[in-house]
Amino acid sequence: MEKRKVVWDLCSGLGGWTEAFVQDGWVVIRIEINPELEYVPFTRIWDVKDWIDWIDDLPHPDLIVASPPCTEFSCADWRKDRNTFEPDMSIVKACLDIIDYIKPKWWVFENVKGACPYIRKLIGHHKQFIGPFFLWGNFPSIEDRRLRRYKKDIAGKKSRQRTAQEVAMIPFEMSFQLKRAIETQTRIDRWC
């Protein structure tokens, strides 16, 4: 029997990044600081900045996905001159420190366009972007043709106000396409 693959979802919010992995039987560990989200399955309420306290107690991941809060980078939140604005990068750095310490086979770091100049200073240019989602990391390219509909939905009117977590949630289709890309790459690796 093949060992179950493990994914860690840092700053997981509602868990959108890893939903396809849950459905496929991966071991999913979601790390989130907001106690209001403890109801989300597989979520542990921990601070990524305190990672040294809990990291060695978890199974080693094949994949780490990280989506630090984007409020620091949102264009709508820039209240200061863009040339002097310096966001708090502590959560971003903690996520990157975890990735560097663990060295998983695959990792994806997601944030908004406004984060690009700041994250670029730490890990270079983004690898891929899909709609409002900018992606850095070591991962097979995600097919985005099926995600075009989502790009239109983002601006659509909703019958109710969405929570910050709902707005920030990675759509299931992105989770599915990432899982599919990793599975395809794994099959190619076995064949070579």
Mark where each language-model region is.
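Phosphate-coordination loops involved in phosphoryl transfer and adenosine-cofactor binding
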Residues: 2-4
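SAM cofactor-binding core of SAM-dependent methyltransferases
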Residues: 6-52
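Class I S-adenosyl-L-methionine
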Residues: 10, 32, 42-45, 51-63, ...
